[in-house]
């Protein structure tokens, strides 16, 4: 009984210490490139979304930051984003480790591979711009499935100020070659 009470109090204190997420527009003055998608964003089952044309970054600041931050790129085959199970659902765990966590809602490529990559790079820039505010020293990028492909591409095809300090890849797509 004491163990259940202790675990319940721990869960409640963790929930109370969690900070509210902050959502930022990735490109408040308009994105530098376009994916050509003009149809409205669609909310699909299980909090998946498609037709993303206005990317955002949702930040979950750690209550007791350790200096690390992770930008998560949800997967979805570059046609939709699995925002919960490959994004928002992991925020509490990362925050409990002292890691500021951010979920990137990136634009679909729609034949323009540079579009999601520019969103990933901009997310890293934004995290660094707010480094003092969120007590960040290192910014990493993480992704699952197609998001893992995007994360690894962002980590290897960077420009000044967009190179992540580390990467975490969950079952990433490593080839777009469908012949194998």
Task: Outline where the language-model segments fall.
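Short beta-to-alpha linker loops that shape the active-site pocket of alpha/beta-hydrolase fold enzymes
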Residues: 76, 105-109, 173
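N-terminal cap/lid segment of alpha/beta-hydrolase-fold proteins
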Residues: 19-65, 113, 178
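Primarily recognizes the serine-hydrolase "nucleophile elbow" in alpha/beta-hydrolase
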Residues: 122-180
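Short beta-strand element of the alpha/beta-hydrolase
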Residues: 67-76
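Short, solvent-exposed loop/turn and secondary-structure capping segments
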Residues: 37-38, 82-84, 153, 179-180
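A fold-wide structural signal in alpha/beta-hydrolase
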Residues: 69, 95-102, 166
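Catalytic nucleophile-loop/oxyanion-hole region of alpha/beta-hydrolase
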Residues: 82-84, 89, 104-138
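Bacterial Sec-dependent N-terminal signal peptides
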Residues: 1-22
């Amino acid at each position: 009984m004491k163990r259940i009470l202790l675990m319940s109090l721990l869960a409640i204190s963790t929930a109370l210490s969690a900070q509210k997420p902050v959502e930022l527009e990735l490109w408040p003055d308009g994105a530098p490139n376009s994916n050509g998608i003009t149809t409205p964003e669609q909310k699909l089952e299980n909090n998946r979304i498609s037709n993303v044309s206005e990317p955002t970054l949702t930040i979950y600041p750690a209550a007791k930051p350790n200096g690390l931050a992770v930008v998560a790129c949800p997967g979805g085959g570059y046609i939709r984003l699995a925002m919960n199970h490959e994004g928002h659902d992991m925020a509490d765990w990362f925050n409990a480790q002292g890691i500021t966590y951010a979920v990137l809602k990136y634009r679909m490529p729609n034949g323009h591979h540079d579009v999601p990559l520019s969103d990933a790079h901009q997310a890293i820039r934004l995290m660094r711009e707010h480094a003092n505010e969120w007590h960040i020293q290192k910014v990493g990028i993480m992704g699952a499935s197609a998001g893992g492909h995007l994360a690894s591409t962002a980590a290897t095809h960077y420009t000044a100020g967009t190179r992540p300090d580390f990467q975490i890849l969950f079952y990433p797509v490593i080839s777009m070659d469908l012949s194998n």
